[in-house]
Amino acid sequence: AQPATPLLAYRWVDTDRALADQLALEDEGQAGTLSPGHAAVRFTNPTTGADVLPTMRTEMHRVRAGGATRVHREVGSSVFQVFDGSGTVTVGERTWQVARGDLFVVPSWQPFSAQASAAGALDLFRFSDAPIFEALHSHRVQVTV
């Protein structure tokens, strides 16, 4: 059997640069982020563009210091790890402080948002089961603008 991806290591230096470049494009007035102050990189198979794993999506998100993501909800569950930084996250009606090393879960169709502290960016590693719901043609995302 072939591995899901020929790339066995996704280097932080490359991920960090991609996130920083997206935010730099935003600073120059160009589109490059998911929303103001919120950049993301999806880890993919470089030969196919598909997710690294057939049933799991992996991403790294960066929220600029003092910035916040838009509130969104989607079909499928996600697990986040705070890779670096600190801030607050809101899942459903519950809000709490997070810092480096913390893990939190966002259940299916629960509203979610994250805000970075004023002291620095908030880097979040996310994995989700979105590819399963996409294959079933039942993946939905709702973003509050």
Ranges and model annotations:
Residues A1-T55, E59, H139-V145:
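A short, N-terminal "cap"/entry segment at the start of jelly-roll beta-barrel domains
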Residues A68, R73-R100, Q110, S138:
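A short beta-strand-loop-beta hairpin characteristic of the jelly-roll/cupin
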Residues P54-R57, G76, S108:
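Exposed loop/turn and edge beta-strand positions of beta-sandwich/beta-sheet ligand-binding modules
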Residues V91, V98-A118, L124-A130:
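Conserved metal-binding segment of the jelly-roll/cupin
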Residues F80, A119-R140:
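A short hydrophobic beta-strand segment most commonly corresponding to one strand
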